[in-house]
């Protein structure tokens, strides 16, 4: 068997070299310590377009709250979103829950064991189906994500780069697959792309399969991604709530994003208000943050505001709600809202570090979801 420009012997040698490297160097990640297809499914959905470091912060708590597929299926959407908060791309969480409900209702509560059947579930495409099937069930089907696409394009010397070669890679990856350890081999290919065969400045001298690569050492540094910028302003509105046990609890006003919003639909955040060109009539913001989502930097200012200063009810159809601080952890908040509330010391039990008053554009912290 040969794979493109590789002979049958080279394919066997490449597999062996890659697996030896992976066994010695793979990262110790919680979803690699389990053979539970459900846990692997959750991890793969979280890892879509999200850094491993960000997933690690949420995976353990999500699995602790939803340890089984049945638990997830029986939980409200808002609670699932609350435990997803900070990961972004919230449609993934909605589809994950929807798919869990489908499996319980139509599959007897058992996740299908083949990539073909997995693709019929909401939110599961070719990549995710192959990952679950190979890692969770041992099906010999190749995974092709961005990392594998880049590795295969360089390894085979395919012309035109990853985008142009995308149609050729799945078949090549399938022929290269180690059928004895398909799940580990797929993870090894992805690990190689994540740690060694980087988009810019690939570490060719450290690559375990460099002798088989047709483009080793030829890669130029990719230009820096151009980021767009947008300013956004939020109101921090507080009031003393009803008397309880002799104390009046502080309540915060939250606003729900529209269900048809392109980002974070249906999530809760602090009310958005028009930008204050002169610092809200002389007031300085309580907090300023830079918040990066995909290719846009959002420069967010948070001003203390009275409820009477907000116009109307936030526009037609806008839903607002007063909540106590103790209710915040169970709310499906946007990642920016959750982190801002912690920085503002409004999160229950969170003292945080001292937050200086910042002038717009100065001393900005970066928050990436």
Regions picked out by a protein language model, each given a short descriptive name:
Residues 3, 8-12, 16-219:
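Catalytic cores of DNA base-excision repair glycosylases
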